[in-house]
Every structure is written in structure tokens, then in C-alpha cells.
């Protein structure tokens, strides 16, 4: 059975949670391999809506083992808040496994994240202020705190002391904040040690053994391709690897283990925070997409920026991830439009780019070149086969498939769990 990676193919909020939830009933493990609680995904089951930020969406599916990999940064307070909320709603969370190598978000990094963003003013990146970036910076600077450190107070105290030597200088002398004490930080972290201990495993070993047994493992990316620290619109990106490659480094499996890579992509485009966005709409069309699509962040509540479908980005995401399939979401949001534009290339100072411009400056100044397709007015939320869709909706999907270069294997036509049209089997190909 396969290892399948699910990634966002735009700037996030594409509906990865729904896609992984759809596959979840057919897999044995669902693994979150990057990011933290800086992104959220919503899963609707019947009348219940679940907004998850740190936990893998597989936790909602009985008999599936949800895993938090070593590439994730964990806020323990948020972790246990989410677990408590799910428990009160009758969800069994006892199967959760967490990598001993995952890094922890200490309280001082949340503080640093918020004050740094305010300090940057107009140059701010648009972070969520949850300490994600500073914690990944600690990881790369080799002053980070890992889950396994909770079980040796001496090591934990030494690591906190080492980190605070510099961080207190910044807090006090740059931001005019009070110094953080070693004791308050250690106490805040140790509060969770006994509760988290039963969940901690060597996730690399667990996942490789599962694949050896022929079980199916699904890896879900946080954020998205265009927010990837290497391949996204740098510096307006997240701090982790949000492409398919991150599934390997963030969980401890080798690249030859991966069988399929699925990109989740909206029928239009959205973005939260700062950074370039070639197809962005500022007028009535943008507001229509925002209101009809409910485009407000699960984690922040911020209104998302909206724009038309961008095939240049879709082709780029397919290339850097090695996509085998697209899952197209929110097709129903486009119902009622007379014409639906699709960006197929960019114009940059009179030069046409059919692929992503090689430098960030050109991308900032890119003007989309559109093709226009006829819209449809029929309600498609109850469509369950491709033939149930209006002819113009079918043509739109087929056109996106053609200009994006990767087959569309499933189509989302509403928020409900069942509101999905399968075209090809995502697990077997």
C-alpha cells in the first residue's frame, strides 16, 4: 500500500483538511510533518464543524493513527486545548503519536514573534504571532527545545538558560520588555511533561514499519507551496518546508517510499498576509469570492485576499512537488458568474512568462494574461458525479486540467464531507 503526500498548491487554505479527511477512512496513518498552529483546517462532519490547528485531520477518523512528526513545532498549551475540545465532543484522541524530535514553542518565542512583527511596521511579514518563526530559527541555530527534553529537567533547564541568554538581551534592550526567567519557562513546559509522555514515540521507526507491513500512510502538509521557505514567495513565506520534500525530512521516511503526491488547489486563489499576488481582485469580484467562499482565516479570522485561478502557479506547484494529481476545491463558489477568468501567463514589462518568473522582483510586477470561460448558474452542491455538473462547469474543470498540466482527480462542490466528486482513485492511481 502507498505513502501519499497531500500539499497545498497555492498560498494555503485550499481545503487540505477536507481532502485528507476524504482519504482518511482508507488509510492507516495520517501524519502532520511541518508547521505548527499557525495554520488551520476545517472539517465538516454532519452538523459538526471541526477547526483544527495543530492536530492532524486524521484524528477525526476512527481506526486511523494521527502522527505529529519531527518537522512540526508544538505549542503544548494549544495541543492540549485542541485535545480537550475534541474529547468533550466525543472524539477519541488516544491514538495520537508525537515525535520525540519535534521542537517545542516556548512562551518567550510567542512574545518575540509578536513584538518583532510590531517593530517591523510596514516591513512586517504578516505572521500569526504564534512563535512559529522564532522556534524554527532556534532549531536552525541549535538552541531549540525538543519534546524529549521534557523528560530530563537538567537538560531542559540548560537549554532554556542557553536560549534566554540572547533572547533576554533582545527583549530588554531592543523591545523594552521584561526579562523572562528560567524558572517560569521551565515550569510552564514541565506542566505538560507527564501528559505528553504516553504519546511520544520514534515516529520515523513507526512509519517505516507501517509501510513495511503494507499499511497506507498519508502525509499532510501545513501551509502550502507558495509559502514554502525555499520555493515560496520569499520572504513572505512560512518557516518550514511545505512542499512534498518536507514529508521526508519532517517525518523520517525516505523519498523512495512516496507513491503519490496530491496537490489541493482552489477553483480560484486566496492569500492571507503580505506578499505578491498577481491575480488579486480589489473590487466587487474580490468581495464576491470572499463572501461566497467564506474566505476568513481559521486560525486568525483575518479576511483573505482573493483572486482568479492562476495556472502559472498551478504548473509551478506541480513541478516543485512532483504532483501526480490535483484535488480541485470550492468549484461551487464560482456559480453565478457570467464569465470566469483563468490566468494562463504573466506579462512583465512587455515580456510574456508562461512559467514562474525566475526572480521575485519580476513576480511582484507580473500582470496576469487571462483566458475567459463561460460561467454557470445551476446549483452544483449536490453533484456527485462529473456528469452531474453543468456543461460549462465541466468545461471549466477540463480547461484547468489542460492549462495546469496535471489531472484533476477529485472536485469539491461544497463544505460537507460528502460534497466531493471523485474522478480517479487517489490512492491507486
From Swiss-Prot:
Pathway: Purine metabolism; AMP biosynthesis via de novo pathway; AMP from IMP: step 1/2
Presence of keyword GTP-binding: yes
Its EC number(s): 6.3.4.4
Catalytic activity as recorded in UniProt: IMP + L-aspartate + GTP = N(6)-(1,2-dicarboxyethyl)-AMP + GDP + phosphate + 2 H(+)
SMART domains (UniProt xref): Adenylsucc_synt (SM00788)
Domain of life: Bacteria
Pfam families reported in the protein's UniProt record: Adenylsucc_synt
Binding residues for IMP: 13-16, 38-41, 128, 142, 223, 238, 302
UniProt similarity note: Belongs to the adenylosuccinate synthetase family.
Name of the protein: Adenylosuccinate synthetase
Organism: Beutenbergia cavernae (strain ATCC BAA-8 / DSM 12333 / CCUG 43141 / JCM 11478 / NBRC 16432 / NCIMB 13614 / HKI 0122)
Amino acid at each position: 500500500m502507498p505513502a501519499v503526500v497531500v500539499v497545498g498548491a497555492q498560498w494555503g487554505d485550499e481545503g487540505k483538511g477536507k481532502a485528507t479527511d476524504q482519504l482518511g477512512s482508507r488509510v492507516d496513518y495520517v501524519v502532520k510533518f511541518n508547521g505548527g498552529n499557525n495554520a488551520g483546517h476545517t472539517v465538516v462532519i454532519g452538523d459538526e464543524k471541526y477547526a483544527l490547528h495543530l492536530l492532524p485531520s486524521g484524528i477525526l477518523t476512527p481506526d486511523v493513527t494521527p502522527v505529529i512528526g519531527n518537522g512540526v513545532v508544538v505549542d503544548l498549551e494549544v495541543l492540549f486545548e485542541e485535545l480537550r475540545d475534541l474529547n468533550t465532543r466525543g472524539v477519541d484522541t488516544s491514538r495520537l503519536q508525537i515525535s520525540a524530535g519535534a521542537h517545542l514553542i516556548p512562551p518567550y518565542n510567542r512574545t518575540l514573534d509578536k513584538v518583532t512583527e510590531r517593530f517591523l511596521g510596514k516591513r512586517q511579514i504578516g505572521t500569526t504571532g504564534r512563535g512559529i518563526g522564532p522556534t524554527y530559527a532556534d532549531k536552525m541555530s541549535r538552541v531549540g527545545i525538543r519534546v524529549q527534553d521534557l523528560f530530563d529537567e537538567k537538560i531542559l533547564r540548560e537549554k532554556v538558560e542557553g536560549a534566554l541568554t540572547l533572547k533576554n538581551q533582545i527583549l530588554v534592550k531592543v523591545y523594552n520588555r521584561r526579562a523572562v526567567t528560567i524558572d517560569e519557562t521551565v515550569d510552564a513546559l514541565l506542566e505538560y511533561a507527564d501528559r505528553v509522555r504516553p504519546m511520544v514515540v520514534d515516529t520515523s521507526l513507526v512509519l517505516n514499519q507501517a509501510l513495511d507491513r503494507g499499511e497506507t500512510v498519508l502525509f499532510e502538509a501545513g501551509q502550502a507551496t507558495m509559502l514554502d521557505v525555499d520555493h515560496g514567495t520569499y520572504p513572505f513565506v512560512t518557516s518550514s518546508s511545505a512542499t512534498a520534500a518536507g514529508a521526508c525530512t519532517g517525518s523520517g521516511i525516505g523519498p523512495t517510499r512516496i507513491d503519490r503526491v496530491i496537490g489541493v488547489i482552489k477553483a480560484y486563489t486566496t492569500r492571507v498576509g503580505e506578499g505578491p499576488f498577481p491575480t488579486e481582485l480589489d473590487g466587487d469580484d474580490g468581495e464576491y469570492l470572499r463572501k461566497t467562499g467564506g474566505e476568513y482565516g481559521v486560525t486568525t479570522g483575518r479576511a483573505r485576499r482573493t483572486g482568479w485561478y492562476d495556472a502559472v502557479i498551478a504548473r509551478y506547484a506541480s513541478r516543485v512537488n512532483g504532483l501526480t494529481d490535483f484535488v480541485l476545491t470550492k468549484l461551487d463558489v464560482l456559480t453565478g458568474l457570467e464569465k470566469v477568468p483563468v490566468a494562463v501567463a504573466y506579462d512583465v514589462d512587455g515580456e510574456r512568462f508562461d512559467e514562474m518568473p525566475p526572480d521575485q522582483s519580476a513576480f511582484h510586477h507580473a500582470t496576469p494574461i487571462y483566458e475567459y470561460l463561460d460561467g454557470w448558474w445551476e446549483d452544483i452542491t449536490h453533484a456527485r458525479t462529473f456528469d452531474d455538473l453543468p456543461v460549462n462547469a465541466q468545461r471549466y474543470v477540463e480547461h484547468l486540467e489542460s492549462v495546469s498540466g496535471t489531472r484533476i482527480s477529485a472536485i469539491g462542490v461544497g463544505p460537507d464531507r460528502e460534497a466531493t466528486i471523485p474522478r480517479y482513485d487517489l490512492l491507486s492511481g
